[in-house]
């Protein structure tokens, strides 16, 4: 299903707003014959569209209505089912009786100035369903395939003040293929799209915030940076910039080694005196950043500002530390101080 409607910011889907979404459904018989949708072995936007209307989930198009056969069916659903024109190549899916995959490439939505948003992509499956189960109603439990990432900040000392203008994360995988699990209680798996162009399959950068003036002046209470504007990212393991090693001392060497770091434009003051930047100028520091982003988890990072590194790997004040947590969108299992 395609739409020209432009999104403005990623909106994580919760049980409270699920009814504002739609999804596309496929159903296959035991021998792999398509009963709803079609045997789809190429990425696209096929399937039977289901929407929430008049208090219930229903077929968007009456012509798609299907009645229960005598045998069991395996159902697969992809949410959202409506794809805006600008995201058609970023988000696609395919489904057959044996393999179901999602192709998704994230966009730098907070840095691109396009007004478009990443999708909180989800899937659901219900295998071996018959007309006698659940009064003939197929029950879907949608699961997120992406990770959610947000930031807060504190200062290292109570007499410090930090003014943040921009934060970016460098050397992050932008997308890949997600293969649905064999059973509904599985987790699925991500793989790299090696056959796609480097700008799609390679590493990129994500903007956390830009062109802002966020003041941080407490070493006990964290100041919010992006908890209401979360980034949605592909789950992955991030290897932090190894600034202490000779082979990866500089930022350029870290880029070549595919090591991850934060780029932060800020001003740092202590007792009113500028340690970094000035009243009229932000300065850029770089901070090694590593963690494992998990599927369906919300990762919360608290930056503890005391300094960082320049692009040659030389210390600027004291390096920033982290405190990290994750729960299930759910936040991921721990808070991470950075």
Task: Tell me the role of every PLM-derived stretch.
Residues 1-2, 293, 297-338:
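Intrinsically disordered, low-complexity repeat and linker tracts
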Residues 1-174, 195, 199-237, 263-272, ...:
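Short, low-hydrophobicity acidic/polar segments
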Residues 17, 132, 143, 279, ...:
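A generic structural signal for short, solvent-exposed coil/turn residues
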Residues 19, 187-189:
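Intrinsic-disorder/low-complexity recognition with aromatic hotspots
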Residues 95-124, 277-309:
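Short beta-strand elements
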Residues 172-183:
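Short aromatic-acidic-glycine turn motif
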Residues 215-294:
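Extended, compositionally biased non-globular segments
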């Amino acid at each position: 299903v395609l739409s020209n409607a432009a999104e403005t910011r990623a909106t994580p889907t919760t049980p409270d707003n699920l009814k504002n979404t739609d999804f596309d459904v496929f159903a296959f018989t035991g021998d792999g014959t398509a009963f709803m949708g079609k045997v789809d072995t190429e990425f696209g936007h096929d399937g039977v569209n289901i929407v929430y209307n008049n208090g219930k989930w229903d077929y968007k198009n009456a012509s798609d209505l299907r009645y229960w056969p005598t045998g069991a069916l395996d159902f697969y659903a992809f949410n959202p089912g409506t794809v805006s024109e600008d995201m058609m190549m970023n988000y696609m899916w395919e489904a057959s009786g044996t393999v179901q995959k999602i192709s998704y490439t994230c966009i730098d939505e907070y840095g691109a100035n396009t007004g478009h948003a990443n999708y909180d992509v989800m899937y659901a499956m219900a295998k071996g369903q018959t007309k006698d189960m659940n009064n003939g109603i197929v029950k879907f439990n949608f699961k997120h395939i992406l990770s959610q990432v947000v930031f807060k900040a504190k200062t290292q000392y109570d007499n410090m003040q930090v003014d943040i203008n921009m934060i970016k994360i460098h050397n992050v995988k932008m997308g890949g293929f997600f293969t649905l699990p064999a059973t509904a209680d599985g987790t699925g798996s991500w793989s790299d799209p090696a056959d796609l162009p480097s700008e799609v399959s390679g590493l990129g950068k994500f903007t956390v915030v830009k062109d802002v003036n966020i003041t941080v002046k407490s070493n006990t209470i964290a100041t919010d940076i992006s908890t209401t504007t979360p980034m949605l990212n592909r789950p992955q393991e991030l290897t932090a910039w190894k600034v202490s090693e000779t082979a990866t001392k500089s930022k350029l060497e870290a880029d070549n080694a595919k090591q991850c770091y934060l780029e932060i434009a800020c001003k740092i003051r202590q007792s009113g005196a500028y340690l970094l930047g000035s009243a009229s100028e932000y300065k850029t520091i770089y901070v090694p950043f590593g963690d494992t982003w998990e599927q369906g988890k919300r990762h919360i990072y608290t930056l503890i500002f005391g300094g960082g590194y320049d692009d040659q790997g030389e210390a600027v004040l004291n390096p920033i530390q982290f405190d990290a947590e994750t729960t299930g969108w759910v936040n991921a299992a721990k808070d991470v101080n950075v």
